[in-house]
């Protein structure tokens, strides 16, 4: 007697392999996405909601929905427009000088010399010191009576009398920008140094054989290959500097006479000094839009330059 084995029909999986592979990829991204939503998206939505209400902490009885009232107040606030102008000076003055000096430092650190490893390590020192500590150090250096900067400039004959750097409306912004530049140079130096080390030496050797000089090699080899790093690093610094308030809070508190008051410090003062969270929310939303606009404009401009090349 012959036994016949009937093959069972192959069951089709409920989810195809392609869909499962896609779901696996999304599952890896889910924790980061949830973290991003919790730390970025939710605070932005809460700030937008807050900006639509009259929310003064010591006047709970006045809490009510006012729509765009805080934004209309912002448009009519002369201090806001002053802080916006100061923010532009603060951001672009700081980032431009940080980039130029950081690029120069990266080119120097790329060269071979005795003690190069030690110098590269020391270059990071301004960057790893907390911002509050940097502010306290430079506040002491700028001190008019016993500060090192005044004493040094008088000794070398560049000044005849002591200057109150942080108390002068004409000099305070330059002083805090210089401090921020000193702290931010290592960021660009290390980023660009990493890019320089990735450029193949064969390109420079071939260009030198063809008769290209130092400037030609820099312009046609170094700069184009470093452009992606420059774009990302500069955009990152623009965003960070727009939000960076530690130095100004410690060194000047936004003074004298709002000469160093930027939009981020003004927002914090409205929230935690005036306790006007509704107006602070409107300021934070506008600051976010300004940052996004400047970043988009910068990325659009740099992309246009790449396309023309």
Annotate the PLM regions:
Residues 21-309:
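A structural signal for multi-pass alpha-helical bundles of membrane permease subunits
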Residues 1-19:
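Short, Lys/Arg-rich, polar N-terminal cytosolic tail immediately upstream
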């Amino acid at each position: 007697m012959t036994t016949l084995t009937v093959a069972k029909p192959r069951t089709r999986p409920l989810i195809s392999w392609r869909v499962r592979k896609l779901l696996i990829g999304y599952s890896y991204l889910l924790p980061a996405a949830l973290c991003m939503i919790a730390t970025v998206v939710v605070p932005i939505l809460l700030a937008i909601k807050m900006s639509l209400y009259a929310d003064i902490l010591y006047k709970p009885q006045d809490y009510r929905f006012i729509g765009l009232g805080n934004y209309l107040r912002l448009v009519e606030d002369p201090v806001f427009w002053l802080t916006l102008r100061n923010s532009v000076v603060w951001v672009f003055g700081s980032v431009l000088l940080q980039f130029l000096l950081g690029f120069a430092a990266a080119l120097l650190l790329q060269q071979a010399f005795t003690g190069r490893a030690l110098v590269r390590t020391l270059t990071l020192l301004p960057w790893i010191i907390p911002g509050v500590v940097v502010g306290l150090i430079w506040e002491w250096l700028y001190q008019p009576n016993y500060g090192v900067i005044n004493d040094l400039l008088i000794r070398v004959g560049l000044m005849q009398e002591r200057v109150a750097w942080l108390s002068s409306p004409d000099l305070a912004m330059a002083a805090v920008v210089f401090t921020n530049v000193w702290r931010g140079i290592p960021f660009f130096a290390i980023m660009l140094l990493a890019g320089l080390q990735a450029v193949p030496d064969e390109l420079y050797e071939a260009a030198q054989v063809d008769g290209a000089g130092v400037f030609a090699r820099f312009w046609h080899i170094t700069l184009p290959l470093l452009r992606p790093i420059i774009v990302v690093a500069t955009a990152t610094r623009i965003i960070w500097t727009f939000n960076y308030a530690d130095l100004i809070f410690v060194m000047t508190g936004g003074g004298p006479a709002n000469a160093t008051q930027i939009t981020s410090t003004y927002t914090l003062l409205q929230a935690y000094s005036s306790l006007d969270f509704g107006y602070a929310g409107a300021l934070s939303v506008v600051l976010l839009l300004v940052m996004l606009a400047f970043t988009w404009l910068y990325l659009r401009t740099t992309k246009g330059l790449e396309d023309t090349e």
